[in-house]
UniProtKB/Swiss-Prot annotation:
The modification N6-(pyridoxal phosphate)lysine is found at K108. GO terms for molecular function: pyridoxal phosphate binding; threonine synthase activity. It comes from Buchnera aphidicola subsp. Acyrthosiphon pisum (strain APS). The lineage of its organism: Bacteria, Pseudomonadati, Pseudomonadota, Gammaproteobacteria, Enterobacterales. Pathway: Amino-acid biosynthesis; L-threonine biosynthesis; L-threonine from L-aspartate: step 5/5. Its EC number is 4.2.3.1. One of its GO terms (biological process) is threonine biosynthetic process. It catalyses: O-phospho-L-homoserine + H2O = L-threonine + phosphate. Its cofactor is pyridoxal 5'-phosphate. PROSITE patterns: DEHYDRATASE_SER_THR. PANTHER family: THREONINE SYNTHASE FAMILY MEMBER (PTHR42690), THREONINE SYNTHASE-LIKE 2 (PTHR42690:SF1). This is Threonine synthase.
Length: 429
């Protein structure tokens, strides 16, 4: 698999290098030179496979020249060794596709665990690796869990202080060992900026073996393609004809993966890019002006991102496939409407959380006659226990993954969003 840097097309690397580097020169994201496709006959065969076999088949379309299918199967099985997604009926024409049945109760488990397996496989010389990543909530826990206790790997996670839920924080800031966490006095965009500055410091990058586990890393992105095929396999032939998928969007990695599944050959009619008040992309799609505003805090905190990294990949994909960007559906939802939507879902017999509620709301409002809709459930409601209980006035029991960590002390450090402070921390052995 060859990939090129979106900021410098002359910089081309293979899959192994892209996984290890994370970012290219000038902080550019890597994108596939070739966009593989599957025929309708191949698709029919793939949809009949079990999740692990199908995922191996899909991923091999991208990376078979570097990793054998047998080797890939082994690592996919290890990465996805948890309960697979569930489809839950909400109304006749709208179902929720739950992606939060992994060890950290969020869809990020798919990408983070596959990336950890790829680092394990590709680090043939057992070199020391430092994984630096920023999180707006769920990435931190997924990455920490995926790399916890892994030899020669140090993980450093940045997150905005006071802007993720208490239970999200408990999942990754109580581990210790090779997992280091730093709360930043600022927004997620400040955290992301610090990560990019670290990658721009060539000397630092080389001295500590710097890598990133955000959705900017191509291995995470490719892994997420797999569950879109799973979703398609779980619905009827009739429902497949006019399928619309609503995706809660923060850094837009989840939507990028969905669009890559469509590029590969999955016949999805349309996607809805769903945001909260941090609506840079909906405004851009509406008026053609890219104008990020200051990030605002919302009850759907994992989507509190005003400068999404993966948007450049989406634009590149639309350009390469000659798709019309105007056909991408979009919308943003306020906190008040999110709360009302959570109540609506509860009346329908479904306990959800703010991020999925936003996707449901926009799907419900935009779904046309004869269309069938899926909205992605990206995190377990218990991760937002206080918020959801306050809105629904209904108690939520904690899964064991959260119950086991709730009383553990936080081990986080705290710094201002100043690169020199982070650099000092990174250089400490």
């Amino acid at each position: 698999m060859k990939l090129y840097n979106l900021k410098n097309h002359n910089e081309q690397v293979n899959f192994e290098a892209a996984v290890k580097l994370g970012l290219g020169q000038q902080q550019g994201l890597f994108f596939p030179v070739e966009l593989p496709t599957i025929t309708p006959i191949e698709l029919s065969k793939i949809l009949k496979m079990d999740f692990i076999t199908r995922s191996t088949e899909i991923l091999s379309k991208f990376i078979c020249h570097e990793i054998s299918k047998e080797e890939l199967y082994k690592h996919v099985k290890q990465a996805f060794s948890f309960k697979h997604p569930l489809k839950i009926k909400i109304t006749k024409d709208i179902h929720c596709f739950e992606l939060f049945h992994g060890p950290t109760l969020a869809f990020k488990d798919f990408g983070a665990r596959f990336m950890a397996q790829m680092i394990l496989l590709l680090n043939k010389k057992n070199e020391s690796v430092t994984i630096l990543t920023a999180t707006s909530g769920d990435t931190g826990a997924a990455v920490a869990n995926a790399f916890y206790g892994m030899k020669n790997v140090r993980v450093i996670i940045l997150y905005p202080k006071g802007k993720i839920s208490e239970l999200q924080e408990k999942l990754f800031c109580t581990l210790g060992r090779n997992i280091k966490t730093i709360s930043i006095n600022g927004s997620f965009d400040d955290c992301q900026k610090l990560v990019k500055e670290a990658f721009n410091d060539k000397k630092l990058k080389e001295s500590i073996g710097l890598n990133s586990a955000n959705s900017i890393n191509i291995s995470r992105l490719l892994a997420q393609i797999c569950y879109y095929f799973e979703a398609f396999s779980l619905i009827s032939e009739e429902q497949r004809k006019n399928l619309v998928i609503a995706v809660p969007c923060g850094n837009f990695g989840n939507l990028t993966a969905g669009l890559l599944s469509k590029s590969l050959g999955l016949p999805i009619k349309s996607f809805i890019a769903c945001t909260n008040a941090n609506d840079t992309v909906p405004r851009f799609l509406n008026n053609g002006t890219w104008n990020p505003k200051k990030t605002v805090s919302t009850i759907s905190n994992a989507m509190d991102i005003s400068q999404p990294n993966n948007w450049t990949r989406i634009e590149e994909l639309f350009y390469r496939k000659k798709w019309d960007l105007k056909k991408l559906r979009f919308g943003s939802v306020s906190d008040h409407t999110t709360e009302e939507t959570l109540k609506e879902l509860f009346k329908l017999g479904y306990v959800s959380e703010p991020h999925a509620a936003i996707a449901y709301r926009l799907l419900r409002d935009q779904l046309k006659e004869n269309e069938f809709g899926l909205f992605l459930g990206t995190a377990h409601p218990a991760k937002f226990k206080n918020t959801v209980e306050k809105i629904l006035k209904n108690k939520i029991s904690l899964p064991s993954e959260l119950q086991n960590r709730i009383d553990l002390p936080l081990l986080s450090h705290n710094i201002n969003p100043v690169f020199s402070k982070l650099k000092t921390f990174l250089l400490e052995k």
